[in-house]
A protein has these predicted regions:
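P-loop NTP-binding/switch modules centered on Walker-like glycine-rich loops
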Residues: 178, 182, 186, 190-268
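Conserved ABC ATPase "signature" region
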Residues: 79, 130-147, 253-257
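A short, proline-enriched helix->beta-strand linker immediately N-terminal to the Walker B motif
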Residues: 171-175
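ABC ATPase NBD coupling module
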Residues: 22-25, 80-96, 122, 242-247, ...
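Short catalytic/signature loops enriched in Gly
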Residues: 2-4, 18-23, 237-321
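Conserved ABC transporter NBD signature motif
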Residues: 71-79
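Conserved ABC ATPase signature
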Residues: 152-156, 160
């Protein structure tokens, strides 16, 4: 097996909760609590879960936009969090992030040609005379025309702005792209176009994606493997086909039951979860999902389930499986 492009081992990210004039730490928000992920070159791994499950924090911590609390993150065998700022800067172009909101991720006062080409100059990847050609290439790869280069963000639609965001990541020729809810702010018809663009770029450039989303119907079209997060922990991981055909964790089953079926005559039994997602400051003892699980037993309230292989490379953290 080839060397993994990205290895995340037992990653934890806790944010301190402070109180009083002296900002005394009184607790921690356990945004990410013992997550492990491996991505092979050319693979797309989908990370799904409700809002507040810690998906985006995983992505930001992998890119070292925020420091980890514990665990290990290796990119091409290099421990990201052990690098000095100068060493990290050298590999930054190889790892890029696509933001969720195409409206706020672009500076309204900066022409898109400058927004896309700025990183090329910052990293010294080409001369000033070559920037424009590199930007043209990135724009055209993302379905935009070269004459758009001197326009401002307000002159584009939401879908076009997201294409600009993709071009900004693509211009550095990265190997890994972390896409944080890249289609959630777009209309459904535009979502399909952007998903197809991601697939096309992966095939032509050999990109590796960590695709973060709350929508299982979106990751089904793009991802080869899927991980389901809840309250900072991984509940289940499996290949796309295995997860959709044979979901094992009650939380995964509930998420899948909410995915619309395109055939009106077919009906899926809806699993409605009770209550709200608990606070990550004081998560429940035992299985974090037991407060909302319709099948919870006494063991679920006291013992943390082991994340284990249930067969066919299908991993799940549940006492009932």
């Amino acid at each position: 097996m080839p060397e993994a492009l990205l290895e995340v081992n037992h990653l934890k990210k806790y944010f301190p909760v402070t109180k009083g004039l002296l900002n005394r730490t009184v607790g921690h928000v356990k945004a990410v609590d013992d997550i492990s992920i491996t991505l092979q070159p050319g693979e797309t791994f989908g990370l799904v879960g409700e809002s507040g499950s810690g998906k985006s924090t995983v992505g930001r911590t992998i890119l070292r936009l925020t420091d980890k609390t514990a665990g290990e993150i290796k990119f091409k065998g290099i421990d990201i969090h052990s690098l000095s700022p100068a060493e990290l800067r050298k590999i930054r172009p190889q790892m890029q992030l696509i933001f969720q909101d195409p409206y706020s991720s672009l500076n309204p006062r900066v022409r898109i040609g400058d927004a896309i080409g700025e990183a090329l100059l910052d990293h010294g990847l080409c001369s000033k005379s070559e920037v424009r050609d590199r930007v043209f290439e990135a724009l055209e790869a993302c379905g935009l025309s070269s004459y758009h280069i001197d326009r401002f963000p307000h002159e584009f639609s939401g879908g076009q702005r997201q294409r600009i965001g993709i071009a900004r990541a693509l211009v550095l020729n990265p190997e890994l792209i972390i896409a944080d809810e890249p289609v959630s702010a777009l209309d459904v018809s535009i979502q399909a176009q952007i998903i197809n663009l991601f697939s096309k770029l992966q095939q032509s450039r050999g990109l590796t994606y960590l695709f973060i989303s709350h929508d299982l119907s979106v990751v089904e079209h793009l991802c080869s493997r899927i991980g389901v997060m809840y309250l900072g922990s991984m509940m289940e991981t499996a290949s796309r086909d295995e997860l959709f055909k044979n979901p094992l964790h009650p939380y995964t089953k509930a998420l899948l039951s909410a995915v619309p079926i395109p055939i009106p005559k077919l009906k899926r039994e809806r699993i409605v979860l009770k209550g709200d997602i608990p606070s990550p400051v004081s998560p429940p003892a035992g299985c974090k999902f037991h407060t909302r699980c319709p099948y919870a037993q006494e063991v679920c309230k006291s013992e943390i389930p082991v994340f284990r292989d249930a067969g066919n490379n299908h991993f799940v953290a549940c006492h009932l499986v």
